[in-house]
Amino acid sequence: MWTHRLAAFALGCSALAAPACAVDDSASAEDDLTSVTARSRTLQFEGYVYVAPTASDSEILNAVRAQTQTAFGALRTAEIGVNNRELKAVDVATFTRANVTIVNPDEPSEPGTPMIRVRYRYTDDAVVPVDMAKRSALGLAVMSPSYKSQTKRILEECTANDSHAQDFASSIWYVFDPSLASCRKAMAAEQKAIDDASASLSDPTTQVVKEEVGRLYLPTTVSLGPDKTNQGKSYPEYDRLFAGGVKPDTLVFGLVNGYLDHGAHDATDSGYAEWMDTLKEALKVRDFKLASIEPAEDLSTFDVGGKTVKSASFADLVAWETDNELPDGLTYADRLALKKAVGAKLVGHWITLAAPVTVRLGDGAPRPFTIEILTYFGADSSPVPHKKAIKNSDVFIYNGHSYIGYGPLDPGNFSVADFPSSYQILFIDGCVSYNYYEKDYIPLKAGGTKNLDLVTNGLEAPAYNSGYALGRFVSRMIDGSNASYAELLKAAAATDSLRVVDGELDNAFDPDKARLVVE
């Protein structure tokens, strides 16, 4: 997890962006969020771009969006998550245009080149760390819309230039970090060149120098509105979940786990161990038994080095992997071979585990009920496993890569028909999922937030311990404690990276009015 904290620039509201600094919090129509580690705030910053006098409205919008996208990395490295994907929600109503002329002060007789300077104000919902709950502003920077032509320079000046940054060279906006000393130095040098060249302009209000138009970095001030995080208790709709949604008298958890490593895609991938850790935690709370596996496999017998190894239950397979509690009489090579044999039968298979329980809501009569886990390990870039799990689960949980928003969970891959009509929780435990996989799902769900709660991460989430954290989240949901969302987030605190819940404020369940008993 990247936790570099932004060093404040010596910039106030008079930075190069337009000077209006107050945040109009009424601009946000989003519900407040529930979180343990994050605070929900409205964010604003201003910038400008230069375009040709003949530029169309769409060309101007594209130029502004190219610039606002570069704020993503600047905000991410400052530990701020934003809600609109890649900051594309630009409001054209904030645009102000001014005709300017590019001139060469050393050649006053030359007519210069006409251009249009377009200023804008960008507003978004944001999540910040708790220790930034009262901070009103911070200095950042955005880049020129044509920044892609200078990737090498940006990589060297304004990224850590490590393997992580180099991996993202083609999406340099993701790793742009204006807080770095080398970046501040580069911006200061660029600004000095602009100031020196502009010193002899006869009319600085209408004239600009080529150094200004060609600048790569544009300092700006990010203003933060009041803390609007939900201060009350909110709960999943336990009464609806334990009434049966996608299946009668059954609560279905859809767990999809993706490969995490860049090597071989099998049970040696670190994501496999995380998946097993999730199942281990769930098995601690309820007596889950194997109900089915597709494609069909015999999970009771394994041939290892000429020996036949028997398993009494699915719990044995989990214990072999997570606790190294393998049968006696196996050599070290046999033990490795057994784990490999188990993995070969599980990876790429749909496994259904079921646990019978009895539920009672308030003063109602007890009734038989089933908790199911529909799970799959081995997801990659195909949306097929994710679609199956989402369509057939009441609580969908994904653990894997985010693919910078363009992977299998891209909302563009889904339609309303891909979601059940019943109440549902989606927990997308990937990096920066609050930006990629949050608000765009709400219109895809019939009833919107009346039928959908979302749990996402504002920042990059660590893979290590993710399985344990998600397992704790699941186990608290099914242990009968009526855990609030805050308590569920605390249960999964091992990997909390500005994790937030959205869509929960219109939930009606209240255990003080009608407690759910699960036995």
Residue ranges with predicted function:
Residues P19-C21:
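N-terminal Sec signal peptide cleavage junction
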